[in-house]
């Protein structure tokens, strides 16, 4: 499952969040994260935020990872399960076919 995490923290939490990010990144670099959790990309914003794309077995597993390694960041994060549309994946193609058949049966 792919999950986009939208992080938006207040300026007064910048140092705390940065320390949590360092700890989390080190955990990932040392391959000590829970099985199946992978950070695919991080895009930083200039206004105390970031967008990250994760692969995880489920939303609960990713939230538990954040509870352990980034509790302050977790409070400033919204998670969105997503599906890769381009390049197209089998899951995306199947979702389109399902949508088409659902619309056709109405």
Region spans (language model):
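Short S/T/G/P-rich N-terminal loop/turn motif that feeds into the first structured element of a domain
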Residues: 1-49, 57-61, 82-106
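Short amphipathic alpha-helices in soluble, non-transmembrane regions
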Residues: 23, 62-71
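Glycine-centered loop/turn motif at secondary-structure junctions
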Residues: 36, 70-73
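Conserved short beta-strand edge segments in small beta-sheet-based binding/regulatory domains
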Residues: 72-86
């Amino acid at each position: 499952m792919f999950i986009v995490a939208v992080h938006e923290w207040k300026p007064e939490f910048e140092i705390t969040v940065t320390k949590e990010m360092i700890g989390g990144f080190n955990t990932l670099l040392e391959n000590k994260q829970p099985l199946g959790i992978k950070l695919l990309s991080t895009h930083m914003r200039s206004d105390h935020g970031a967008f990250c794309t994760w692969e995880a077995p489920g939303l609960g597993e990713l939230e538990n990872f954040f509870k352990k390694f980034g509790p302050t960041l977790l409070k400033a994060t919204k998670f969105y399960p997503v599906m890769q549309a381009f390049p197209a994946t089998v899951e995306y193609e199947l979702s389109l076919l399902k949508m088409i058949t659902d619309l056709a049966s109405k």
